[in-house]
Regions:
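Active-site-adjacent helix/loop patches that line small-molecule binding or acyl-intermediate pockets
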Residues: 1-3, 69-176, 199-202
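Short active-site loop at a secondary-structure junction
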Residues: 18-21, 36-54, 69-72
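Contiguous, well-ordered alpha-helical segments that form the cores/surfaces of helical PPI scaffolds
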Residues: 23-26, 53-61, 138-142, 197-201
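Beta-lactamase-like hydrolase cores
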Residues: 1-42
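Active-site-proximal alpha-helical segments within enzyme catalytic domains
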Residues: 187-212
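A short glycine/serine-rich beta->alpha loop
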Residues: 38-46, 74-78, 121-130, 181-187
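Short, contiguous, pocket-lining structural segments
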Residues: 17, 46-47, 128-132, 153-160, ...
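Active-site SXXK
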Residues: 47-64, 83
Length: 212
């Protein structure tokens, strides 16, 4: 049986512990060997947006042309600030698409300031404002490049999603334990914390010019 979560931090006020935060952590070496482990680091979890780095690697393998800030938008969540939204539009424009192609649910920006500005301007929630729209736009651009269907690009059986699952397994060194539906409607893939750490170690030590 895996070790349960452990106390990682305490909130102390005037010498009295008023709160404890439990969790699990793992640190791996460049070769993926475990250096430090606390709590349960072997049971699968849904890393949610932490998987985006691996999925973006899969998109690069398929030919996604975005680089620099447009690759960053594919590899992480964004706050919905104007420059983020403009970047998502650039990804879509380059593929001959507009934001109507996005299947992200309508949302407000994560940025409170950006949300307040939109509310004052009388704007509404929109799919492009959702924090995962960069990844979705990059998937759509890859579909266009590969001449693949757009309407069902979020389906786990879609060729791009199948490849992204393979990228997660290859980079993490572990088979996906379960597939769910993330808040953006795209597949979310379960791996262990150790596998997630190994994936980031692989990315951080990758050769320049490699997909990672």
């Amino acid at each position: 049986m895996a070790e349960p979560s452990v106390v990682l931090a305490e909130v102390v006020r005037s010498g009295f512990v008023e709160g404890r935060h439990r969790g699990s952590l793992v640190v791996v070496d460049v070769d993926g060997s475990v250096l430090v482990a606390r709590g349960d680091v072997t049971s699968p979890v849904f890393p949610r947006s932490s998987n985006k780095l691996m999925q973006a690697t899969g998109l690069v393998e398929l030919g996604y042309p975005g680089r620099d800030e447009l690759l960053a938008l594919a590899a992480a969540s964004h706050d919905g600030e104007p420059h983020h939204v403009a970047g998502v539009r650039r990804i879509l424009d380059a593929a001959g698409l507009d934001e109507q192609a996005l299947r992200t649910p309508p949302d407000w920006p994560l940025s409170t300031a950006a949300r307040d500005d939109l509310v004052r301007a009388g704007e509404s929630m929109a799919p492009i404002l959702m924090n995962c729209s960069g990844k979705h736009a990059a998937i759509l651009a890859t579909c266009v490049l590969r001449d693949l269907p757009l309407d069902d690009y979020r389906a786990p059986s879609h060729p791009v999603q199948v490849h992204l699952r393979g990228a997660v397994e290859r980079m993490s060194g572990e088979p996906v334990a379960a597939t769910g539906v993330d808040g953006c409607g795209a597949p979310v893939l379960a791996i262990s914390l150790t596998a997630l750490a190994r994936a980031y170690s692989r990315a951080g030590t990758a050769d320049v010019g490699s997909p990672e």
